[in-house]
């Protein structure tokens, strides 16, 4: 059983940090039941993911897109753009009102009899 190292994968994904993110995403997919593209050989999911990347049986671009989708909390819609513009104008109005309000005296010196 040959050990896979980061050096085996760096020519496929030049940035080591990106490689770790992509391999972790693939390992999570394998844990979730995704089909393996290489023999497991009693390796754990992260090692299998690195071997798949090294042997180019999975495409890094697809893994990157899956990673981005998994990190998005809310998927953007076309209707959301209109709401954001309305929200920005409401926020600007609230900021204008706050800036125009008189400053409150928050010192405790006059009320404190110490």
UniProtKB/Swiss-Prot annotation:
Pfam families: RNA_pol_Rpb6
Function, as annotated: Promotes RNA polymerase assembly. Latches the N- and C-terminal regions of the beta' subunit thereby facilitating its interaction with the beta and alpha subunits.
Quaternary data: The RNAP catalytic core consists of 2 alpha, 1 beta, 1 beta' and 1 omega subunit. When a sigma factor is associated with the core the holoenzyme is formed, which can initiate transcription.
GO biological process terms, semicolon-separated: DNA-templated transcription
Gene3D superfamilies with a match to the protein in the record: 3.90.940.10
GO cellular component: DNA-directed RNA polymerase complex
Record's keyword terms, sorted: DNA-directed RNA polymerase, Nucleotidyltransferase, Transcription, Transferase
Catalytically driven reaction(s): RNA(n) + a ribonucleoside 5'-triphosphate = RNA(n+1) + diphosphate
Record's keyword annotation contains Transcription: yes
InterPro entries registered for this protein in UniProt: DNA-dir_RNA_pol_omega (IPR003716), Pol_omega/Rpo6/RPB6 (IPR006110), RPB6/omega-like_sf (IPR036161)
Transmembrane segments: none
Enzyme Commission numbers on file: 2.7.7.6
Naturally occurring in which organism (per UniProt): Novosphingobium aromaticivorans (strain ATCC 700278 / DSM 12444 / CCUG 56034 / CIP 105152 / NBRC 16084 / F199)
Any one Gene Ontology molecular-function term assigned to this protein's record: DNA-directed RNA polymerase activity
Gene that encodes it: rpoZ
Lineage: superkingdom: Bacteria
Similarity comment: family membership: Belongs to the RNA polymerase subunit omega family.
Protein's name according to its UniProt entry: DNA-directed RNA polymerase subunit omega
């Amino acid at each position: 059983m040959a050990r896979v190292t980061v050096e085996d994968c760096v020519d496929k994904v030049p940035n080591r940090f990106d490689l770790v993110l992509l391999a972790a995403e693939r390992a999570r997919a394998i844990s979730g039941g995704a089909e393996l593209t290489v023999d497991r050989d009693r390796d754990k999911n992260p090692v299998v993911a690195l071997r798949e990347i090294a042997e180019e049986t999975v495409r890094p671009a697809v893994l990157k897109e899956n990673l981005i989708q998994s990190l998005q909390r809310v998927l953007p819609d076309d209707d959301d753009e209109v709401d954001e513009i309305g929200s920005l104008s409401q926020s600007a109005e609230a900021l204008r009102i706050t800036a125009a309000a008189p400053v409150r005296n928050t010192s405790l010196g006059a009320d404190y009899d110490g």
